[in-house]
C-alpha cells in the first residue's frame, strides 16, 4: 500500500496556483470533473497534492447552505458512498481535507484486518481522455468512516494518470511527501510515506512534510494558503552524507 496523493480544497483555483507557485512549486493544470476543477503539484516519488475547487462561487454557497441546514448530514446517514465523501469536500472548510492510498487490489484491501470492521464504499470506475488521445482509467473506493482514507487502483499505467517529466521539478527543490501527521489514527499503513497520529491536531486535520534538495526550510500555512499546514524540510539523506 502506498500514499498516492493528498486533497487540498481551495476557494479559488487560480489564486491557489499563483500562491503555491510563489513558494517555488511547479503547479500542473489538471481538468474538470462535474462542478470541480483541479491542478496538481507532482513530486518525483509518485506522490502529489491535488488542488481542487468548485468552478462556481455560487455552487460553493449552495453547498455550504445544504450543509448548514443538515441536508448533507441526512444524506450521509441514509447512504454511505463515494459521492457523500465528495460532497463533504465541496461543502466543508478549505485546507488539506483527505488522503488517498494506492493499491493493486481494492477488493483485498476491503477485507484486510484494519478495514474489515469499517468497510469500503462500492467501487466507482473513472475514465478520462487525455489531449494526446490516451485513455486513463482508475477505480476509487472510500472507507465508510469519513476520516479514514479513500483508495485508488489504476487500470492503466500510473504515468497516464500522474504527469511525469519536468512538471516534477520544482524551483524550491521539493522532492516528495515524506510524512503526514494526522489528527486521527489512520489505517492501514503505507510503505512510501510516514503516517503519524498526532493527538495535538484536531480530528480530520492533516500536517504535511515535504523534503527538498536545497537544504531549505519553510512553513506554508495560514489563511493565505487556505489554512493548510505544509512544512518544507531538508532531505535527511543529504544531511547524513555531510
Give the location of each predicted region.
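Glyoxalase I/VOC metalloenzyme domain signal
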Residues: 1-3, 8-28, 43-242
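Short glycine-biased active-site loop of nucleotidyltransferases that positions the nucleotide triphosphate
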Residues: 32, 39-43
